[in-house]
């Protein structure tokens, strides 16, 4: 189905971002995350990846900004709060 293909594409993009993060190619990883979010504002894993990227380059304000954008998107699109995984990542990256 179309939804399954979309999710498969997002999963492939997430794997690409993880590889780029592993290779410390942070500037290349950011647009991939942004492309995912352009198609689905509430795709929480992309926000977590952005948080990891911004933390890796020492940009703590963007870590928090990415989290806040995630919270807003999840509330507006799905009426839910971020997952425990996202909350734990924020705490780990900002403590």
Give each language-model segment a name.
Residues 1-95:
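Intrinsically disordered, charged and Pro/Gly-enriched terminal/linker segments
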